[in-house]
Amino acid sequence: MGMTSDTIADLLTRIRNALKAEHLYVDLEHSKMREAIVRILKQHGFLAHYLVKEENRKRTMRIFLQYSNDRRPVIRQLKRVSKPSRRVYVPAAKIPYVFGNMGISVLSTSQGVLDGATARAKNIGGELLCLVW
């Protein structure tokens, strides 16, 4: 796959499409940023788990999707906020509460990629990467 200019949007789209198709997992190229986002989604129960594989010096990720008991995707929506063409930065006080606090925001901060609640607790803002609920 050729690298898109927005690897985060690509990550979200691939997860979205895999869920629509009821796939168990999705494979994609690894990056530190992608893994950081996926780790947060897993922590919050939005993804089952993930693996990072290395083959001929190329790293890939396999992301295992999470479905509820009635086989519905746990993730209802993945929304990219900040984009390469239009970056969105928020101070700690403006970090959004997502979907009545059932969802999460993901930020890139001076202390790494964090979910909104953690960034808010540390009183640091950052680039608002995406919302998930």
Swiss-Prot record:
Q: Please give the function described in this protein's UniProt entry.
A: One of the primary rRNA binding proteins, it binds directly to 16S rRNA central domain where it helps coordinate assembly of the platform of the 30S subunit.
One function term, GO molecular function aspect: rRNA binding
Q: How does it assemble?
A: Part of the 30S ribosomal subunit. Contacts proteins S5 and S12.
Keyword check for Transport, yes or no: no
Gene name linked to the record: rpsH
Q: Which NCBIfam families match?
A: PRK00136.1
Q: What is this protein called?
A: Small ribosomal subunit protein uS8
Name of a matching Pfam family: Ribosomal_S8
| UniProt family annotation | Belongs to the universal ribosomal protein uS8 family.
Keywords tagged on the record: Ribonucleoprotein, Ribosomal protein, RNA-binding, rRNA-binding
Cellular component terms, GO, for this chain's entry?
ribonucleoprotein complex; ribosome
List, alphabetically, the HAMAP family matched: Ribosomal_uS8_B
Record's keyword annotation contains Transit peptide: no
Q: Name one GO biological process term.
A: translation
